[in-house]
Swiss-Prot record:
It is a single-pass membrane protein. Disulfide bonds: none annotated. Its main location: plastid. Keywords: Chloroplast, Electron transport, Membrane, Photosynthesis, Plastid, Thylakoid, Transmembrane, Transmembrane helix, Transport. The 4 large subunits of the cytochrome b6-f complex are cytochrome b6, subunit IV (17 kDa polypeptide, PetD), cytochrome f and the Rieske protein, while the 4 small subunits are PetG, PetL, PetM and PetN. The complex functions as a dimer. GO terms for cellular component: chloroplast thylakoid membrane; cytochrome b6f complex. It is found in: Plastid, Chloroplast thylakoid membrane. This is Cytochrome b6-f complex subunit 5. InterPro entries: Cyt_6/f_cplx_su5, Cyt_6/f_cplx_su5_sf. The gene is petG. The chain crosses the membrane at residues 5-25. GO terms for biological process: cytochrome complex assembly; photosynthesis.
Length: 37
């Protein structure tokens, strides 16, 4: 059995991690376009 608190933390971190990766990829993509690469 997984503790509810630990389960809640994992469920909370997953969307934050996915959002962080998406934002980082978007910023890197946009920055590359600004330099014409």
């Amino acid at each position: 059995m997984i503790e509810p608190l630990l389960f809640g933390i994992v469920l909370g971190l997953i969307p934050v991690t996915l959002t962080g990766l998406f934002v980082a990829a978007y910023l890197q993509y946009r920055r590359g376009n600004q330099f014409g690469l």
